[in-house]
Amino acid sequence: PIVRCYAHGFDDPGCSYNRAYASALSGWNQIRPHLPVMVLEYYNVSKFEDLPLLFTHSMAHDFQVYRRTGAAGFVYMHVPLVNWGMRTLTQVLFAELAWDPDADIAKIKAEFLSRRYGAYAGRLRSVYDQIDMASQQITSWRAWKDRSLLSRLQSWNGGRPERPLQVDDHFQTPEAFDTAGEQMLSLLQAALLTLRETLSAVKHDTAAIRTDIVTAVNPAQQRSAQQSAQLRHALEEDLRLLVYGTDTMQLMLRMGQYYTALYAGCDDRAA
């Protein structure tokens, strides 16, 4: 389902993106003699451009649907090669749910955060939750379909538009797009602030541990130094990815707002 919607369940009949996919999967699995059908998801489709997206909100439900409709297997594109950052959670959930669709997502997520961030897991939970919420309408923003905002903007020549900004039926109007975009950006900026503050706290709390110049004299010191280095690496990787994601989504939002301002003749706002 390369242009599926993640704001709604895969089997939601009210979703204009998903209902055709759900119908197709159900139809294929009713063919006799039965043919094994696999699902190819797109948690990192090329149009997402390695953005720091999370799909925890939809994965538990969707894997249940895939099993219920008779899917014989599950893969997805494209598994990131480097700089997984917070997307590491998606890899963990994918592996766990592909093995057991009934797996406890809340438990898996809590264990993941604890192992990755240790004493700072509580802070990062809010970061992950905010990114997850901000990711829900990503298909309306950028997808392999001409009704996504990215496709609309890419076909625009930059001059004064002759018609209002076209948005999909999930946004419905340019005004609703504007509101949803500001909410999305607010979530990402809040997550970014928490992440920066957490990294600063980690640097302060571990200032005495200088693994580059101090040699551990016992196993406890060695473990402490390794854990400190791993934690900072994880947070710095998360930060790089989230800065990129926030900047990218802000640029898309502002371009959409610029289009609307030009169309309305509000040159002062467009400037």
Predicted regions and their residues:
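Catalytic-core regions of glycoside hydrolase
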Residues: 1-109, 115-116, 182-185, 189, ...
